[in-house]
Amino acid sequence: MKAVVYKGPREVAVEEVDDPAIVDPTDVIVRITSTAICGSDLHMYEGRTDAEPGITFGHENMGIVEEVGQGVATVKSGDRVVLPFNVACGFCDNCRAGKSAFCLTVNEPGTAGGAYGYVGMGPYGGGQAEYLRVPFADYNCVPLPAGEEHEKDFAMLADIFPTGYHSTELAGVQPGETVAVYGAGPVGLMAAYSAQLKGASRIFVVDHVPNRLDLARDLGAEPINFDDGDPVQQITDALDGFGTDRGTDAVGYQATAASGEEHPATVLN
């Protein structure tokens, strides 16, 4: 099959690689129909990690189940599925407690967790390919309605929307509160949308890329362009001198100062 293969910093290639195969009876093989590029894929692409050449990128995946292991009960060949980016077993104590990111079966010592196509997160191939092996398929495959009408919407469920939503969970957003979202990339926009779903009264999205701020406005948020001045001052002016009740950082360690220098250790408080 064809797959996107990492060759080294800022170098990838579409190459022929071996087709994935059923290894365990709980596996399925999915034919990929949509896969997204994550900002964390770019971390590897830019050489910010110790990713080894040969890795296939892609942890935001969906597609059609093509082959099913004998131990799989909840999905069958032909099902459309979306695949949450974090691989987990579904039956350990942590998974049963809803803490699948800390799966006791998948998270081997010395790893950051389990994910498709990511350095240090297990032996799972990425989905920027024609086919993908999915372990523990009863837990890691989310069945979808038939048809392609909402293909682009469902692709957001693999990572982008739940990551944005989780940020509002961590922030504790409650109905009627005001919220500031720093960063209007895909995750930041989904954080703003999630805050809206949670009933936030006003949502401010800080960025300086015009089309991203336009998208924030389309979602019902109030765009704050930091090229126009201190974003904190702009927000407090809009709130009669008060700050927001909640905030979320959708920029991460690539946050930069006004000078353009990155400050990876900066924490918003």
Placement of each model-derived feature along the sequence:
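Glycine-rich beta-strand-centered segment in the early N-terminal region that forms part
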Residues: 18-35, 46-96, 101, 124-125, ...
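Short glycine-rich anion-binding loops that position phosphate/pyrophosphate groups of nucleotides
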Residues: 35-37, 253-254
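Iron-sulfur (Fe-S) cluster-binding segments and ferredoxin-like electron-carrier domains
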Residues: 42, 96-116, 120
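Mid-domain Rossmann-like dinucleotide-binding core that forms the NAD(H)/NADP(H) cofactor-binding site
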Residues: 80, 130, 143-229, 233
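Redox-cofactor binding/interface segments in oxidoreductases and associated redox assembly factors
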Residues: 83, 181, 249
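Glycine/Thr-rich phosphate-binding loops of Rossmann-like dinucleotide-binding domains
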Residues: 91, 189, 256-258
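A structural motif shared across PLP-dependent enzymes of the aminotransferase-like
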Residues: 125-136
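Glycine-rich cofactor phosphate-binding loops and adjacent beta1-alpha1 units
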Residues: 171, 198, 214, 219-269
